[in-house]
Amino acid sequence: YADITFSSQADLIARYSNCPVGRGQKRTSAGKAWLAHTDRRQYEGIVFAPGEEVPGYLNLDRGFAVEPKKGDCSRFLEHVRNNICKADEEISDYLFTWMADCVQNRSRRPGIAVVLRGRQGTGKGILCSQFGSLFGQHFIQVSQASHLTGNFNSHLKDKLVVYADEAFWAGDKKAEGVLKAMITEDTIQIEMKGKDVITFRNHIRLLVSSNHSWVVPAGNEERRFFVIDVGDGRIQDRSYFGGIVSQMNSGG
C-alpha cells in the first residue's frame, strides 16, 4: 500500500457522493453502498509485521521489491570491501552480516545503526541506495534529522531500512533520545497530522552517511552505532561508480 488515508464515515460518503451505483430505488452512492455491503473488508486496525499473518488486522508488509535470481554484483561487493571498508576484513564482514540480517530476519532489529563517515563523492550513497532498493516502499531516504525525530513521522510506519543522507545531530538532546530509541526500542510512536498517535512495532534499521566529522551522538561507551570511516581512493570517480550502477541495473 503506497499510503493509508483515514476518513470518518461522513467524509467517506461525501468523497464518493458523485459515484452512483445501482438502479431505481436501490440507487445510492458508492460510499453508502460499501458501508452497507455484507462482504466489505474491515479490520481492527493496521500493523506492520514483516513476514507475519496478523488475523483481523491490515498488514502493511508488501515484501521485497525484487525476486531473487542469480546475477553478478561483484563491482558492488568490491566497492563495499575496498572503498567503504578500506579493505578491512573485520569491518566488511560485520557490515555484510548486518546487511544480510536485514534481508533474512526482517522482523528483527540488531539494535545497531550503521554510520558511514567520509568525504563527498566516495560512494556512500551508492551503497545505501542500491541496498535500499531491495525493500521497495519499506525503504526511505531522508535528508534532515527532523524527518527522523520530528513529531509528524507517518512516513516511518512501514519502514525496514531508513537512510539518513547528510543528516546530523547538533547537540539536540530531545532528538538524541528519539534517535536512540528508534535504534533500540521495540515500538515506535507514529503521529499523523490531525490523528491520534498510534503505536507500531519498530522494525527500522538505520543507515546514516555524512561528510561531517561529528555525525551521531556517540560517546566513548556508546554501542548503538557502528561507525565506518570511508576510504577516498575512488573519490569523484564517475566511471567507476557508473560501472557499479550499470552492473546492478543489469541483473546484479
Regions found by a protein language model. Name each.
Residues 1-70, 74-75, 104:
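Intein modules and their embedded homing endonuclease domains
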Residues 48-167, 175-176, 226, 230:
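P-loop NTPase catalytic core of nucleic-acid-dependent motor ATPases
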Residues 136, 175-198:
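Conserved catalytic/switch belt of AAA+ P-loop NTPases
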Residues 151-157, 191-209:
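AAA+/SF3 P-loop NTPase mechanochemical coupling elements
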Residues 160, 171-175, 196, 221:
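Helical "lid/switch" subdomain of P-loop NTPase nucleotide-binding domains
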Residues 200-203, 218-252:
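Phosphate-sensing "switch" segment of ASCE/P-loop ATPases
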